[in-house]
Every structure is written in structure tokens, then in C-alpha cells.
């Protein structure tokens, strides 16, 4: 578990205990990186974390092979991340159909207006906006806020990355976001329960 920016976080905390702490503090779902090369995750990590907390689990992966969907199902995932920028419009719709056929809810991650164009012609359950530019790693919450009016009306709107304070959450709620994918500020804090209370209590 980790990121290209932070490197591996292995040994800094126990992922299963962390997942259990999230659940005890009221988290609605668990996002688990399963991509091994850049984010140091695994499907085994997802299985262990879900068993420890019982929350619905989102597998975070760069999906390019149908076997990845099958591995996610076998690991116990309930949803899968689809990074819109990796696909054409038809490819994205196809991956979403393949995920749904396996019982996985697709969370489509967008970052800019060109990604939103890929969503046209399909109904989406969940659409996220990543506040982090994966090319520069810079974070700007104003990015999500500007994108929010263009998200599909029926989709659960998820703000992703850069959420560190209650003021951030309130700002994004006011913009119309329904859910929040919080990563680093929880992973790097000393007490996840206290941090979740600070953000959402």
C-alpha cells in the first residue's frame, strides 16, 4: 500500500486494523489499492481488509484485462474503479457492462472535461472527480467544484483526493458532492477514528 508520490507505506501501519478503525468510526465503504507496481497494493490486501471491517470494498486498479475484474470479485470487491482517461467512450461503456455482469459497481474516475465526454450515452451509478492531477500530483479542490455541475445528474458524485479538513468536506458538500474518497489524510494520521470524526462528525 502506498502511492507513486509517497512510495510504499508497508510497515507504517497495519492495514487490517486501519480498516477496522474506519468501520468503527462510521466509514460507509473501503477503498483498497490492488495495483502492485505503482500503489503497492494487492487483491490479497483487499480480502484481508474487507474481512477485518465488513464494509463494502472498492478495488482501485488500472483495469485493462478482464481477468482483473474476476480477481476483484474473487477477492471480495463490491465495486471497481474505472479511470476514464484510459479508455475510449465505447471501451469505458464496455468495461462498465463487464463489471456489472460480475456484480461489481463501476466507480468511474474523471479529472477533466475530456473525461466527462466519455460518459455520454450511458447511465452511471457513481462518478468521481479526482482533485489530484496524476501527471503533476498537484491537488486543487476547486477542480472538483468546477466539474460538479457537469456530472451526470443521476450518478452518486464522489470527490476524490486532497480532502484533509472539515472545511474541505463542507466546501465540497456545498458544491453538491454526495460522497468523499479520502486517502492520504487518513493513512498518514495517528488516529483514524479521530480524523474521521473531524472530517464528518
Where are these predicted regions, by residue range?
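Catalytic cores of alpha/beta
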Residues: 64-76, 111-123, 159, 163-182, ...
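Glycine-rich phosphate-binding active-site loops on the catalytic face of alpha/beta enzymes
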Residues: 71-91, 128-137, 177-196
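C-terminal helical cap(s) of enzyme catalytic domains, especially alpha/beta-barrels
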Residues: 146-150, 173, 186-201
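Active-site beta-loop-alpha junctions enriched in small/polar residues
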Residues: 1-2, 35, 62, 85, ...
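Glycine- and Gly-Pro-enriched alpha-helical subdomains that act as flexible
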Residues: 34, 44-48, 52-68, 74, ...
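Active-site mouth loops of central-metabolism enzymes
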Residues: 1-15, 56-64, 107-109, 158-163
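Glycine/Thr-rich beta-alpha phosphate-binding loop at enzyme active sites
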Residues: 4-10, 18-38, 119-148
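Glycine-enriched alpha-helix->loop->beta-strand junction motifs that scaffold or abut catalytic
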Residues: 26-27, 52-55, 74-80, 100-104, ...
